[in-house]
Amino acid sequence: MPAILQLRLTTLLPQARRFTRPAFRLPILPSNAFIRLSSTLPAARKLDLVDLDKKWQAKWQLDAAMTQAKAELGPESKPKSYILSMFPYPSGTLHMGHLRVYTISDVISRFYKMRGHDVLHPMGWDAFGLPAENAAIERGVDPAVWTEQNIAKMKEQLRKVSVEFDWDRELATCDPDFYEHTQWIFLMLYKKGLAYQAEALVNYDPVDKTVLANEQVDANGFSWRSGAKVEKLNLKQWFFRITAFKEMLLKDLDSLTGGWPERVLSMQRNWLGKSHGARVTFTVAAGSQDDKGVNVNVFTTRPDTLYGVEYLALSLDHPIVTKAAQNDLALRKFLDEASSLPPDSKAGYCLNGIVASHPLQSIDSTSHHLTRKLPVFVAPYVLSDYGEGAVMGVPGHDSRDMAFFKENVNPETISLVIQPEPVNARGIEAADTVIPAREAKAFTQDGFLTPLCGKYKGLHSKDAAQKIVADLEEIKKAEFVETWRLRDWLISRQRYWGAPIPIIHCGDCGPVPVPVEDLPVKLPKIEGEWLKGKKGNPLESSEKWLHTKCPSCGGPAKRDTDTMDTFVDSSWYYLRFLDPANKESPFSSHLARPVNVYIGGVEHAILHLLYARFIYKFLAQSDLFPAIANPENLKVPAEPFQTLLSQGMVHGKTFTEPSTGRFLLPTEVDITSPDKPLIKGTQVTPNVSFEKMSKSKHNGVDPTLCTAKYGADATRAHVLFSAPVSEVLEWDEAKIVGIERWLSRLWKLVFDAQRNLADCSFTIQSADLDSAGHAVSLSSVQGLSDSDADAILATHNTIVSVTTCIESNPYGLNTVISDLIKLTNTLSSAPPSSPLVLYLSISSLLRMLAPIAPAIASESWEVLHESLKDPTPSAPTPSIHASPWPTSILTNEQCDAISARGGQTVAVQINGKLRCAVTIPHMPEKTTTPQGKGQTQEEQEWIISRILETAEGKVWLQEKNDWGKRKRVIIVKGGKLVNVVF
């Protein structure tokens, strides 16, 4: 066995002390630092996690240090971290999704506090909106009263899951002190021409009786909230001109790479929808020779397919359609029915006597099929706000067009004008590109133009597109253009429970902004018939509130009765947390800053996150951000959220009756044997699956019931351990027993350690507990016993792994739990014999546990230090949550020295022939291994470098072979065999 080198550890304290028996000393811990359990050494008490919750939650609630208000995030020397979870709608009940997101944010927040950061971790309430209004109507109460009651309930529920928020910064979007500034931001946008009112065809929810943004209508045309079939109406609405920021919103996504999930970035890019193509002009006319027709512009990203156009399709509200409907009863009937069809419907109506002329016939007289008159259809799949409400149909090269054409024309053949191979490659003739319709499949890739394409035959798609558009441009039939999917943000809602739009309508002056000094425009108190279920907007009938004077001329005027979309509130709330008591402005300019880590569901990838980016970029150009008021001076793009954690959903265990598919109540299933559930009464085995939690599936789980049964610590740890943050969490309550067993082992470990430390009179200065990453330091690794060496190495590796995960890869928080379980098992199976190593290992384990399971960590910390006495205490002992995060214990050399005990034998082959066997140190194990098989590049290099240090390795790899000319190195069987190929 090679001798362990005498390696000194890096000093961990300003005055590091050598601990030698019997000189271990500790001060008596102040009584206000730890609650003493008894005057004698305790026996291991039975672990009661629920009782620990009650004790420590009550203590934290009274602890001024835990709730001390910070006047502002000032220019202190501490690094600052802003950790924020997406604030909830106050429904009155926490669900498992809430528990997951707030546990994640709480762990990260507590971690950075222990790392010495000035951490902002606030909580607020997304309190406006339809759910609160509808719930209040159902109950006959004021939405403000109902919301306030729910907030109080949810605050208590959050306290019971041991999450620590900066409650002194709490806000609710329905508070006039908050929405005063929402209205101010509206006026800032209005002043810049970015808030405007316009007549528009809008999405109207007939159940909730309000307008919806495009993003709030699903792919099948249903409301995201009520589930009602959305209607299309022409109404005057308020918009934010988000399209003015479209280039910035797209370009700056690149700066978020690495900080945001690629999936979310892709979703935003797709929603912004920048595309390059051409605007092509078709002439549409009635069949008579007297009708010269009108120009209809279509946008296409594939002008190379123009020779394959078989029809034009118009939107339901296109002017040509509207005019034709005046004299076509069947068309009017189709339009009535089509408004309820899904956007992907293949239904169509061919306009009688209306045809289109192909623009290419003006420049290509040899392709006779271009002279055909093209039918013109009305189709629900054509969006009125895409291009100009018209599209060209190319069945041979678009799957949707193919399906529509077959449905409405029933053609015998389909023409292909693009082929994957050049025309001359295999002698393709024009006849070869006309395919029977029943056999035809759309070819949607780039390729080469076929003989049907006249003078463009044989050109590649990209070249043909350029040439065709250029030729049509000369006769003013086409031009290259850029289009976006993004539309301006419709923000007005015809409901009561929202921030009133601060505009007054005057008969003489038109719309006039409310003066800033008159903000907030408060909601009037409602009562009477509306609270009994009357539909519509009560602001329209609140006479005293509605009628006012014009701020401009002083004449009679009316307030705008629309309220703002709740996404306006959430587009800036994170900035208000920075300065929640500011009466003069939304926030002080010197406090403006982005969120460091933002946690929330991927379902907000388009709506909330896109709107928040827009508003932040707008505000960054205002006087509220004076340091970066000029975008040209920005060193980095103005983005509100530097790192985004998108957690997966929580699915619940679902039981269904096999023969009927009926969802079963949990009370209908006998789970005496969890692995073999049976339906009560029939004793039939139900189908078991994990699905999104919902009342209809009877698979919802109340997190407060879990914490009442198992304790908050076990519930939190189980939530983290069950799945990586980004993945769906399949909640299985039966498996929480594994977490309970781990915490019980840890509990016993702490009591055993406390007794052993007391027996050897181990002492520690209480002031040292908050001075560095460790209260004591190890002077040397020489002479460590096997159990001490294993313990100190395992502790060191766990500290490195857990710290790296939370800092650099918080999506892997499940591995943090597994790392702590492994360390607990190592210390339990072979307890360290050295008091110093024992204390270092146990205290480090508890500090790493503190963000995850705060109550048992606090109690265990108290137990561990109970009998560590120092007769002259110099400072109160901090709680574990105020103690520093543990730092690395060993250097790389020390890790190698400890790992080398005994060594490992490696067989070395050269070109497949065994040449020698060498002994090298054990490779330091990484506590959390990367996914996949085999060694990482770093591990391979470590093994090779150790082989080259041996005498045999030098002879065979350097002297007898030229190591520099090696072709490859293959390492297998965990490093036991190395094959070098020269």
Where are the regions a protein language model picked out?
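Acidic, turn-prone loop/beta-hairpin segments
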Residues: 126, 503-507, 514, 644, ...
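Residue patterns forming the tRNA-binding/recognition surfaces of aminoacyl-tRNA synthetases
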Residues: 46, 59-63, 67, 138-296, ...
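Non-catalytic terminal extensions that flank enzyme cores
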Residues: 1-93, 231, 249-250, 261-275, ...
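NTP-handling and nucleic-acid-processing catalytic cores
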Residues: 3, 45-59, 179-411, 417, ...
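Conserved oxyanion/phosphate-binding beta-strand-loop segments in alpha/beta enzyme cores
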Residues: 39-84, 113-122, 146-153, 334-377, ...
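N-terminal catalytic cores of NTP/NDP-binding nucleotidyl/phosphoryl-transfer enzymes
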Residues: 71-141, 172-185, 300-301, 368-404, ...
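Glycine-rich phosphate/pyrophosphate-binding loops
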Residues: 109-132, 310, 354, 358-441, ...
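Long, charged, mostly alpha-helical binding arms that flank functional sites
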Residues: 130, 277-279, 422-466, 470, ...
